[in-house]
Amino acid sequence: FSGGDPVHLAEVFADTPMWKAIVQAWHEGASLAGCSAGAMAFGGKIIGIRRSHITEGLGLIPDIEVIPHYDKFLGWLPDRVTAAIVRKDANTALLGIDENTAVVLTDQWRKYGTGKVHVLRGEFELSEELFPYN
């Protein structure tokens, strides 16, 4: 799933036969990748960086919210990133993924690339090379 507008991606794919087939294939072992907005759309909620509200995501991984380009957005739009973090659902983990960085889920979550992955759960921030998700 490519970048662009995560809300548009979620609206277009939600509750469609295509999305159901994608989820089934993923559960059966197919690879699935989300870049930028695509990664945001996979969560249960989409945190508004461009928009100031939270929107329903596709729910593939319902208890995460993603902010891609975290290091860039934090420099460009610090007030919006801070507001997004404050609006974060208390029951979810927020993944702030820096530029040139990927998070891959196999048996565990792993970080690849030159940047960091900022994991905010509750009031704590974790950032590790290899981190357990649960």
Identify the function of each model-found stretch.
Residues 46-48, 52-134:
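C-terminal and late-domain segments of enzyme folds
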Residues 2-3, 10-75:
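Class I SAM-dependent methyltransferase SAM-binding "motif I" and its flanking Rossmann-like core
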